[in-house]
Amino acid sequence: MTDQGENEKKQRRSNATIAVACLSFFVCMIGAAYASVPLYRIFCQVTGYGGTTQRVEQYSNTILDKTIKVRFDANIANGLPWDFKPMQREVTVRIGETTMIKYEAHNLFGEETYGRASFNVAPGRAGAYFNKVECFCFTDNTLKPGEDLELPVVFFVDPEFVNDPDLKDVKTITLSYTFFPIDKPKPVVNAKAVGSTRNGG
């Protein structure tokens, strides 16, 4: 009887240990899932992996005679009552040449709405060579009822594009944006104005 009781206690302890281990693993997996999204975004922005374009501060110093066609795609996620489209569907540019195109957004709703865009490039490998000098991605945008907004994109294709053997047959690059609904952005406090008020002026 005593041996049976001891065995039952050992079994309960073993079950408890397994339960704790499973719970810990589950919690860790949930945390990793939440952390993986921003980490993956950072990784893609740095490397151009997965069709993420490169953000640069300067223009290309080299312009080649070789040209490539760039197409523009626009999408709206569920819950955002906007009309969103490129003002030009495609352009043919010289590789290394800086080009500006524009998208436009229109609020179809009777109230103020808020959106933020993400982007992607196809084929994915071309993202490492698609350099944006100016864009509206990851910026909070507010549109009043019926308001229109022009959204410029300034870009060039890195001349190193032609040296990548995996892209030798690529004649067209597609830049795609998707707008998602977001909560109303919090107002930015003017620190100077607050300080002046506290000082009596």
Swiss-Prot record:
GO molecular function, one term: copper ion binding
GO CC terms, sorted: plasma membrane
Localization, UniProt: Cell inner membrane
Short name of one Pfam family: CtaG_Cox11
InterPro entries (alphabetical): CtaG/Cox11_dom_sf (IPR023471), Cyt_c_oxidase_assmbl_CtaG (IPR007533)
Coiled-coil ranges per UniProt: none
One of the GO BP terms on file: respiratory chain complex IV assembly
Superkingdom field: Bacteria
Name of this chain's protein: Cytochrome c oxidase assembly protein CtaG
Record organism: Brucella ovis (strain ATCC 25840 / 63/290 / NCTC 10512)
Annotated gene: ctaG
